[in-house]
Each structure stands twice: as C-alpha cells, then as structure tokens.
C-alpha cells in the first residue's frame, strides 16, 4: 500500500535532492549489486527530517488506516516516530488530534523509571514506523513488544518499498520482505513510495534516462 501518486512522486524527488536516493552501482545488505541506493540516514538535519515527517504523516493519512499511536523501534524508528507525531499534530486532516508515540531501548534501564519502553503507554492500535523493511526483524520485535503490552499492531509505515524478492539468488522467495510482513502479521505495510515510483521517474525524466535500463533489469530479476 503506497501513498497517493503525487505524494510518492514528490517524495522520490525530495530523496534525490537530499542525496538519499542515488543511482550507480551499490552492494546492498543482501549482497546484491543494486543500480540504486536509498539511505534514509542522510535525512540528518532539522529541515530534512521535518519534511520527511510530513511525507510520513501524509502517507498514513492517505492510507486510511485507523490508529491510536506510533511506535518507533530503536534506533532508526525513534526520530521517525517523534517527528511524525509532530507532523500529524499539525496536519489539517487530523483536526487537532494529538497523536502519542513510544519507542524502545535496546537495553533495559536499571534506574529511574527502568524498563525498555519510553514515551506514551502502548495502548490501542499502534503503527510501527521505520525507514525500510529488509528482513523484517525489527517488525517482528516491535509486534512482540506491542502485543506484550496488550496493544494491537495496526500497520507498518515505511519510507520506501523496494518491491524486491527475499532470499539468495538460487532460492528466491516468491514474495518480498514487505509482502512477508503483511502476510505473517495480518497488517498492512504502508510506504511513502516504492520502486514503481522510482521507475516512473526514470521513464518520465530524460535526465535520469541513463539509469532506466539497469534499474529495469534489476527489477525484472528481483522484483515482485
């Protein structure tokens, strides 16, 4: 499930402008050589994170998913949940609703309030927010935390869906990591944009035409 076409297109342009999305030849976590690379860690300033949060908020609103709060898995999800909660508070579609958020620590704190959770109590329908889904480990841990608190995972919200089949080349899964998460936990995965939106840019904008063939070949081999 992706955001509206206009939101997705604007986000792809934004990611390019920020150097977060690049074309070339990159060895990615799976070991594959990818003709593009998306590094959300380069959203690293107040302005860029503020804009990113606006895209997350819009994608969540566009999705129509019913939710009560946000959860950001450590570590990448922490600033994403925080900033997106702020963006939602100012979104006109939220009508002044104040969305709480929480996140976890990697290690339990043994002083003060203690525990591994920080922020609002986990209650109701919870949206897990992260940058991408690679193996689904972060989502699994988040779902366990949310359910252990008596709350309900409502959706996973990510920046980019690579639409890429999981597994080694000689044993490719018929599904992507995103599809596996949706099937395993029975919740939607909402993305701001996807590889399909990147392909639309490559097809529509002549300045990126040189990368079109390589990305299309990669998608044909690994895409879903």
UniProtKB/Swiss-Prot annotation:
Name of the protein: Orotate phosphoribosyltransferase
GO-annotated cellular components: cytoplasm
A single BP term in Gene Ontology: 'de novo' UMP biosynthetic process
Classification via InterPro entries: OPRT, Or_phspho_trans_dom, PRibTrfase_dom, PRTase-like
Recorded catalytic activity of this chain's protein: orotidine 5'-phosphate + diphosphate = orotate + 5-phospho-alpha-D-ribose 1-diphosphate
GO MF assignments: magnesium ion binding; orotate phosphoribosyltransferase activity
Pfam family for this entry, one: Pribosyltran
UniProt keyword list: Glycosyltransferase, Magnesium, Pyrimidine biosynthesis, Transferase
Sites where the protein binds 5-phospho-alpha-D-ribose 1-diphosphate: 29, 75-76, 105-106, 109, 111, 130-138
Function noted in UniProt: Catalyzes the transfer of a ribosyl phosphate group from 5-phosphoribose 1-diphosphate to orotate, leading to the formation of orotidine monophosphate (OMP).
Subunit record text: Homodimer.
Cofactors: Mg(2+)
EC class: transferase
Annotated residues for binding of orotate: 37-38, 134, 162
Record pathway: Pyrimidine metabolism; UMP biosynthesis via de novo pathway; UMP from orotate: step 1/2
Homology family: Belongs to the purine/pyrimidine phosphoribosyltransferase family. PyrE subfamily.
Enzyme Commission number, as recorded: 2.4.2.10
Key word Magnesium present: yes
Superkingdom of the organism of origin: Bacteria
């Amino acid at each position: 499930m992706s955001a509206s076409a206009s939101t997705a297109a604007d986000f792809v342009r934004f990611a390019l402008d920020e150097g977060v999305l690049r074309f070339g030849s990159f060895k990615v976590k799976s070991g594959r050589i990818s003709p593009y690379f998306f590094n959300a860690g380069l959203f690293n300033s107040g302005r860029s994170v503020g804009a990113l949060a606006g895209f997350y908020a819009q994608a969540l609103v566009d999705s129509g998913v019913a939710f009560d709060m946000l959860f950001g898995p450590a570590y990448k999800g922490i600033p994403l949940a925080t900033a997106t909660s702020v963006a939602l508070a100012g979104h006109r579609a939220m009508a002044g609703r104040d969305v709480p958020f929480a996140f976890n620590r990697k290690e339990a704190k043994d002083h003060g309030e203690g525990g591994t959770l920080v922020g609002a109590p986990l209650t109701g329908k919870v949206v897990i927010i992260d940058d991408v889904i690679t193996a689904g480990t972060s989502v699994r841990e988040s779902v366990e935390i949310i359910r252990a608190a008596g709350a309900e995972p409502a959706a996973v919200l990510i920046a980019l869906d690579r639409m890429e089949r999981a597994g080694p080349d000689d044993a490719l899964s018929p599904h992507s990591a995103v599809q596996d998460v949706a099937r395993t936990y029975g919740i939607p995965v909402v993305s701001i944009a996807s590889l399909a939106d990147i392909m639309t840019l490559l097809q529509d904008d002549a300045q990126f035409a040189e990368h079109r063939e390589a990305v299309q070949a990669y998608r044909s081999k690994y895409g879903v």
